[in-house]
Amino acid sequence: MALVIKLSGRVFEDEELVFKYAGVIRNLSGKVAVVTGGGEVARRYIAIAKRGGASNTFQDLLGIYASRLNALLLISLLKDAYPRVPANIEEFLEAWSGHRIVVTGGFQPGQSTATVAALVAEAVGASALLNAANIDAVYSDDPRRNPNAQRLRELKYDEFEKIIRSSSLPGGYELMDVWSISILKRNCITTYVFDGRRPDHVVAAARGENPGSKITC
């Protein structure tokens, strides 16, 4: 069975956490695809470029290269992983055909790493996407802004999309976007959202347990 893991870029802001994830991924059975976010490096570089008047496309490129840098770091800790970071879905599939573990970052401007993870999950025929996020579950509203936000243990993609589209959640509190949801929904790929600070939750979700929120068709 193929596993697809989306790692929040915030994971890479904690050195020990990166090592723990490497250990968990190394010990997973079967084939594993990992998509990394850009994290603080991406946010900082994008902010500087934006201040300097760079185009949105150029800002996106900075985010992409930051995510690929995180991917390369993880690859360096996974001795049996494909040694390069695929730059598009074609390169990913070529790497996937001959390696047990493939790690990638962003693919192209205008496309989030959440969408990349959804595309990868679709391409490899994964039944689930494991989203190690910067929040411990999906909430009815952004819990950092609304203390009355309800934690949602199980929900459908239609409900999730409404939450992401909500005007009170700019960016969907960095969880996913409507494009990634569309891809996952059309393939009926289950998504598990859980606290990215807990690498052990990857193991739990890989077993079909729900350590945070479970999103289904």
Swiss-Prot record:
The keyword Cell membrane does not apply. Pathway: Pyrimidine metabolism; CTP biosynthesis via de novo pathway; UDP from UMP (UMPK route): step 1/1. UMP binds at G38, D60, F107, Q108, P109, G110, Q111, S112, T113. The keyword Ribonucleoprotein does not apply. ATP binds at K6, L7, S8, G9, R10, G39, R43, N134, Y139, D142. It is found in: Cytoplasm. It is an enzyme of class 2 (transferase). One of its GO terms (biological process) is 'de novo' CTP biosynthetic process. Keywords: ATP-binding, Cytoplasm, Kinase, Nucleotide-binding, Pyrimidine biosynthesis, Transferase. Its EC number is 2.7.4.22. One of its GO terms (cellular component) is cytoplasm. Gene3D superfamilies: Acetylglutamate kinase-like. One of its GO terms (molecular function) is UMP kinase activity. Inhibited by UTP. It catalyses: UMP + ATP = UDP + ADP. Its main location: cytoplasm. It holds the Pfam family AA_kinase. Homohexamer. Belongs to the UMP kinase family. Catalyzes the reversible phosphorylation of UMP to UDP. PANTHER family: URIDYLATE KINASE, URIDYLATE KINASE PUMPKIN, CHLOROPLASTIC. This is Uridylate kinase.
